[in-house]
């Protein structure tokens, strides 16, 4: 199943994250519709987190570093199903995921609900080179330091996701 393109149908949700209607992805901001996304942080066996640098051709956040995988949920899709789908589509990875929580944040004036998961994988591959400029494993300490010294190198969503994963893991981001 391909990643949701501009005309893919996604759920517009209310302020409690309950579905209201279905809208084309490309209209979510113009309609001021709340929506859902999923982010997965992938860790390797030594505890490094996989970062994805978005392609310079991307419409939103070109060249910025973000979560290992991220994307919109298809209409009717669960967060966990979207996490598995995006791992397969973007990294060629099939694995279990652990839920870290759901984050509510504002994106261009609308609310998005971000389902956050972690997993382990040592050898992901860039399965979408037009979408992803590069992948890089980085130590959690390095990421934490870069988020302080150069926050604009990262997407706003990743900054929040990483913080939530660290909180959920007792101040130490990890897959467990």
Model regions: which residues?
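Basic/polar N-terminal segments that are highly enriched at the extreme N-terminus
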Residues: 1-4, 174-176
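Acidic, metal-coordinating catalytic segment for phosphate/diphosphate chemistry
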Residues: 2-39, 45
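A residue-level structural signature of the nucleotidyltransferase/glycosyltransferase Rossmann-like core
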Residues: 10, 48-49, 135-136
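Nudix hydrolase/Nudix homology domain
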Residues: 26, 63, 75, 104, ...
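A glycine-rich, hydrophobic loop/mini-helix early in the fold
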Residues: 37-69
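A structural signal for short, well-ordered beta-strand segments
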Residues: 40, 69, 99, 115-117
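The catalytic Nudix box helix
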Residues: 50-51, 68-100
